[in-house]
């Protein structure tokens, strides 16, 4: 099973698909914009909820607005709290990758 996260300026959507490509779980929440900590917590909670819902480990793919520079920092995101953050590295650390 695979988890896809679509992170946008208004919402974060999590979708889990099975090996046949069928959606087995979907959830949305508003994108927190007050702080990077709040934003990051929302993302990790979405991943945890998805894992619990399907009761197994998941591979995770994430789409975020903006570009990533050579140092792994997000640039030009419409989610201002993401700019200058090493989101991928932070997420890898949180997931134990």
Regions found by a protein language model. Give the residues of each.
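Short beta-strand segments
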Residues: 6, 61-65
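Glycine-rich phosphate-binding loop and adjoining helix at the ATP-binding site
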Residues: 41-44, 48, 56-59, 68-97
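Short glycine-rich, Thr/Ser-proximal phosphate-binding strand/loop in the N-terminal lobe
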Residues: 2-41, 45, 73-74
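Short coil-to-beta-strand
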Residues: 18-19, 59-61
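Short glycine-rich anion-binding loops that position phosphate/pyrophosphate groups of nucleotides
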Residues: 10, 65-68
